């Protein structure tokens, strides 16, 4: 289970019920497709497993994608490090950095690898460029590409057309699913299945979140979104995640919130600014600013109740060093640090909430990611913006094309 505890004054239900109705209308309209992936993506599991079942030679899955085509998968790879049931390793190329490109290629062999080229539009310049570099690096002929590459894209996109031309297997992203909301589509399901993760449990966790919100009417997401969107002087939300397993999730959270909620509304610029930290490490860097700096931040703590294989700190006594943590489970120490920091911030009258996962597995990862997608959609409704476009990003893309053309 996932528990979300709010340490701030909550609103009367009649104040926020209209926003719940608008989210319901959004679901019923069918215009925003991510809501329905919990059901429609089930068929992808069988299709993915059938495709990969005879490819025993594949030891590496190399995903090439940007933004929404990679952040979510990176989050799942980090969170599900204990869940993998086979030996396929997942590599991710998500930047036009020669350093990371060359470093990744040093670790893989062509004959042991399957490359997933992911671009919703089918024309992402970074993805197309990396695709070409892979062809050149491995000295592949065009007729060989179908053995080593799989495309994930929109139906009838340029990438799909090229896949048809080259005989490359294509998986499709629904047209009404935006990139940063696509983790439960082929973008996430296909690589998870290829690597041996439990994609069905991921969808089941997401569906449980859907039912808690829409059927059981749990209101934590509504309360949290309303509080954070109406506190105009505290428009920075800090996600303080207490486990290194949340490193990729933090990146996904930043992209989801920033690209969805940072918008122009007429002459006004509005939105929540996301900051993501890892505890307990960042207690020794950013915490001072939160505690004593401007009160322009809200803080969400993310923790795991039970962690597997956590060692116990030995009962070793020194003459000068303290023994406070002796015989304490290392994960219990981490959670104690989380709780201590949280209550210190509450004492400073900051708006704080905590999300606690029972454990870290595919089901809980699915619930958590769907929770944040619903939270983002709810904030968008409350802010009166289009949550699902990114006009500011498109401007830079046009300038880049002009630079390259010149």
Curated annotation (Swiss-Prot):
Its main location: cytoplasm. GO terms for molecular function: carbohydrate derivative binding; glucose-6-phosphate isomerase activity; monosaccharide binding. It comes from the Bacteria. SUPFAM superfamilies: SIS domain (SSF53697). The active site is at residues 259, 284, 397. Keywords: Cytoplasm, Gluconeogenesis, Glycolysis, Isomerase. Pathway: Carbohydrate biosynthesis; gluconeogenesis; Carbohydrate degradation; glycolysis; D-glyceraldehyde 3-phosphate and glycerone phosphate from D-glucose: step 2/4. Its EC number is 5.3.1.9. CDD domains: SIS_PGI_1, SIS_PGI_2. It is found in: Cytoplasm. Belongs to the GPI family. GO terms for biological process: gluconeogenesis; glucose 6-phosphate metabolic process; glycolytic process. It comes from Campylobacter jejuni subsp. jejuni serotype O:2 (strain ATCC 700819 / NCTC 11168). The gene is pgi. It catalyses: alpha-D-glucose 6-phosphate = beta-D-fructose 6-phosphate. PROSITE patterns: P_GLUCOSE_ISOMERASE_1, P_GLUCOSE_ISOMERASE_2, P_GLUCOSE_ISOMERASE_3. This is Glucose-6-phosphate isomerase. It holds the Pfam family PGI. The keyword Transport does not apply.
């Amino acid at each position: 289970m996932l528990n979300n505890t709010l340490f701030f004054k909550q609103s009367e239900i009649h104040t926020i019920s209209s926003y719940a109705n608008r989210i319901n209308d959004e679901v019923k309209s069918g215009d925003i497709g991510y809501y329905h992936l919990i059901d429609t993506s089930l068929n992808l599991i069988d299709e993915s497993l059938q495709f990969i079942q005879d490819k025993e030679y594949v030891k590496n899955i190399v995903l090439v994608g940007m933004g929404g085509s990679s952040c979510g998968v990176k989050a799942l790879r980090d969170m599900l490090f204990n869940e993998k049931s086979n030996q396929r390793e997942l590599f991710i190329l998500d930047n036009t950095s020669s350093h990371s490109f060359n470093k990744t290629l040093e670790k893989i062999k062509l004959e042991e690898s399957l490359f997933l080229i992911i671009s919703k539009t089918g024309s992402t310049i970074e993805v197309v460029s990396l695709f070409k570099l892979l062809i050149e690096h491995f000295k592949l002929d065009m007729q060989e590409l179908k053995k080593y590459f799989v495309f994930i894209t929109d139906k009838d996109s340029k990438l799909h057309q090229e896949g048809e031309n080259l005989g490359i297997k294509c998986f499709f992203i629904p047209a009404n699913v935006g990139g940063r909301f696509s983790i439960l589509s082929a973008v996430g399901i296909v690589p998870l299945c290829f690597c041996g993760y439990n994609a069905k449990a991921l969808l089941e966790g997401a569906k449980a979140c859907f039912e808690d919100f829409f059927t059981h009417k749990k209101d934590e997401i509504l309360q949290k979104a309303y509080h954070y969107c109406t506190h105009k002087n505290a428009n920075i939300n800090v996600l303080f995640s207490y486990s290194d397993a949340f490193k990729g999730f933090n990146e996904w959270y930043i992209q989801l919130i920033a690209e969805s909620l940072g918008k122009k509304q007429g002459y006004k610029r509005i939105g929540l600014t996301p900051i993501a930290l890892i505890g307990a490490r960042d207690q020794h860097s950013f915490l001072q600013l939160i505690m004593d700096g401007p009160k322009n931040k809200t803080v969400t703590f993310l923790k795991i109740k039970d962690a597997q294989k956590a060692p116990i700190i030995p009962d070793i006594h020194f003459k000068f060093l303290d023994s406070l943590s002796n015989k304490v489970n290392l994960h219990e120490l981490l959670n104690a640090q989380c709780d201590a920091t949280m209550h210190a911030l509450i004492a400073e009258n900051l708006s704080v909430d905590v999300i606690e996962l029972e454990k870290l597995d595919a089901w809980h990862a699915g619930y958590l990611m769907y929770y944040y997608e619903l939270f983002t959609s709810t904030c968008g409704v409350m802010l009166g913006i289009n949550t699902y476009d990114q006009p500011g990003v498109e401007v830079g893309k046009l300038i880049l094309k002009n630079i390259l053309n010149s």
